[in-house]
Design a protein with these regions (language model features):
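A short glycine-rich, hydrophobically flanked beta-strand micro-motif that places a catalytic Asp/Glu
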Residues: 15-23, 30, 98-110
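RNase H-like nuclease module associated with reverse transcription
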Residues: 73-239
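Generic beta-strand/beta-sheet core signal
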Residues: 20, 33-35, 55, 117-119, ...
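Amphipathic alpha-helical
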Residues: 1-22
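Short glycine-rich loop/turn motifs
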Residues: 28-29, 46-52
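Two-metal-ion RNase H-like nuclease active-site motif
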Residues: 26-43, 119
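A short, polar/acidic, helix/strand-boundary loop motif
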Residues: 52-85
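Short, flexible loop/turn elements at secondary-structure junctions
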Residues: 10, 14, 34-40, 54-56, ...
Length: 239
């Protein structure tokens, strides 16, 4: 019944899609919105959604490359877990896109920076701070996100934005208004919360994350020792 209503709405409302000129490759950036919702399928499984744009950071011209709304196979009980697994899935997609761009334009010119936007404060803090999640099963997933930022360079910045500016919200929650996403597709423009300037967080130090990843690979029962050492080193650098 809901599908019928959606089809009727689609037929009733006329729209258009604008494919703009994206200008010079040196001005390009990838902008990815990632969102998740818990227990939306059969009151058990969560849903992760993302939409990725190729954007000219000078003119704001933008074209969507891909989008997804899929069930998270692992059963989770918290929004932090769902959001974390959603970003982990997104990392694989971003890696694939960046490799294609490198093959098309060369490894140097095709190495386009990537800004990833989330609205989960808990996930943002877990990635940017040296602290453990209460859900020990998430440790490896959060480390994977940290590695994608600090070591692999797949994500250049993980930015926290207000929930009302989350374009992937409509891909994970029924009944949400997708007008801001539709408007961007119609106009071929994307205005990003916080601007197009990508800033690496001062809290993210590659050496810190390498220590955490090394600690996990060496089989620490917990990451407290590695986290404490990394924090001490970071404080020394600041001083």
């Amino acid at each position: 019944m809901q599908a019928v209503k959606l089809l009727q709405k689609v037929k009733r409302i006329s729209t258009k899609i604008t494919i703009p000129s994206l200008g010079e490759i040196k001005d390009w950036m990838l902008v990815a919105y990632s969102d998740a919702a818990t227990k939306k399928i059969d009151h058990a499984f969560s849903v992760a959604g993302h939409v990725i744009f190729l954007v000219n950071k000078r003119t704001h011209a933008a074209s969507p490359i891909t989008w997804s709304s899929k069930k998270i196979e692992r059963v989770v009980s918290s929004s932090l877990a769902a959001e974390t697994l959603g970003v982990v899935k997104l990392i694989g997609v971003l890696y694939f896109i960046k490799e294609i761009l490198k093959q098309m334009y060369g490894r140097e010119q095709g190495n386009i920076p990537c800004l990833t936007l989330i609205d989960s404060k808990d996930l943002h803090e877990a990635v940017h701070n040296v602290k453990n999640s209460n859900d020990k099963r998430l440790l490896g997933d959060i480390l994977q996100i940290k590695q994608a930022i600090a070591v692999d360079g797949i994500i250049d910045e993980l930015r926290l934005i207000p929930s009302h500016e989350m374009m992937a919200d409509v891909l994970t929650k029924g009944g949400r208004n997708g007008e801001i996403l539709l408007e961007s597709v119609r106009n071929g423009k994307l205005f990003i919360a916080g601007g197009t300037m990508i800033e690496r967080s001062k809290k993210i130090e590659a050496s810190t994350w390498r220590k955490l990843i090394q600690a996990q690979s060496e089989g620490f029962d917990t990451l407290e020792e590695a986290g404490l050492d990394a924090m001490i080193d970071s404080n020394k650098d600041i001083k």
